[in-house]
Swiss-Prot record:
Participates actively in the response to hyperosmotic and heat shock by preventing the aggregation of stress-denatured proteins, in association with DnaK and GrpE. It is the nucleotide exchange factor for DnaK and may function as a thermosensor. Unfolded proteins bind initially to DnaJ; upon interaction with the DnaJ-bound protein, DnaK hydrolyzes its bound ATP, resulting in the formation of a stable complex. GrpE releases ADP from DnaK; ATP binding to DnaK triggers the release of the substrate protein, thus completing the reaction cycle. The lineage of its organism: Bacteria, Pseudomonadati, Pseudomonadota, Alphaproteobacteria, Rickettsiales. It is found in: Cytoplasm. The keyword Chaperone applies. Its main location: cytoplasm. Gene3D superfamilies: 3.90.20.20, Head domain of nucleotide exchange factor GrpE. This is Protein GrpE. Homodimer.
Amino acid sequence: MKDDNIENNNIEEENLNIETQVVANEEIALLKAEIKELQDKLIRTTAEIDNTRKRLEKARDEAKDYAIATFAKELLNVSDNLSRALAHKPSNADVEVTNIISGVQMTKDELDKIFHKHHIEEIKPEIGSMFDYNVHNAISHIEHPDHKPNSIITLMQSGYKIRDRLLRPATVQVVKKP
């Protein structure tokens, strides 16, 4: 009987060990699943944070670029006037006038450098290029037998843009259909 009790105790201990092992395995499986779920959440959260950071950087860059748009628009007329002054310089100018013209040229060059630094580009379509309503403003349509319809015949005023944002369209005359 003593042997039977020992054997029963051994069997009970063995069953208890098996049950304990089964419970432990179930807990391990649950913990592994929880770890996997937390790792997935971590990956998604990290990606979300990275996307938010990129979105904020882009918004900051755009705000920086376009914050100067109003100020830049006011400088466009200054640039135009400097260009007009340089286009009408006299060919037989004396030394004083030549020095003034040189100063105007240096001012125009410095303004162009500032525009370039702030990604302000001139829109200066070539004669004969096709009219694009996205960047051109047609002030008149004229007939011209030597040019294609809807092509630019005269550039009245250059346009400007900051990166992909239009500050001012180029003012042009366009050939109309016959």
